[in-house]
Amino acid sequence: MRILQISDTHNKHQQLTNMPAADVIVHCGDFTEQGTEEETLDFLNWFIELPYKHKVFVTGNHDLCLWDADGIEDLPDNVHFLQDRSCEIEGLKFFGLAYNHPEERIP
């Protein structure tokens, strides 16, 4: 399995072109600059449309809009928002620990 990891795109995700082939893309946070809903929706629309089989993301310290979100409604089955939770993709477990996690939520 090939995994592509990106982070800290700060609203510049549209500038990412010709990214390497992979089975899974993981965005490790800071996809927004100010953490607004508009920035977050722009990122999600871009991320969902990427041509990777599986997509995983967590929040960073800039992604304020999703800090208190337990989940996001209506994501496609191949897009995983890991806010202090895990998922398994083709036998490999992914765990997302958000930037602002309370210590008692660490397994």
Predicted feature locations:
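Beta-strand-turn-beta hairpins that frame and shape the catalytic cleft
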Residues: 1-4, 86-96
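Binuclear metal-dependent hydrolase catalytic cores centered on His/Asp/Glu-rich metal-binding motifs
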Residues: 92-107
